[in-house]
Amino acid sequence: LNLKINKGNFHVVAWDFRVKKNSERKLRELKRLGFNANIIGQNRYGLYQVVFESFPTREQAIRKLYKIKKEQNPEAWILVKDLN
C-alpha cells in the first residue's frame, strides 16, 4: 500500500475499491498513464481510495478535475482531506 502522496489536501479521486488488489492494479495503470497517482487509504466504508493526483490548492485540483472528467473518468471528484 503506497501512502506517499503529493503535499496537498485536495485530491482528485479516481475510484474506490473494496478489494485492495484492485486498487493496486488501478494505481499501476494510472502511473503508467503518467499520473502521480496514489492510494490515500480507506474511507469510512472500508473502500480503498485511488487518486489521480493531490494538490495544495483547490484551484489546481479543479483545473485537473475538468481535464480528467473529459479524458479519463467522468465520475472523478475532489476530496478535501488533510492526510498529515
What are these regions (language model features)?
Residues W15:
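Conserved beta3-strand ATP-binding lysine motif
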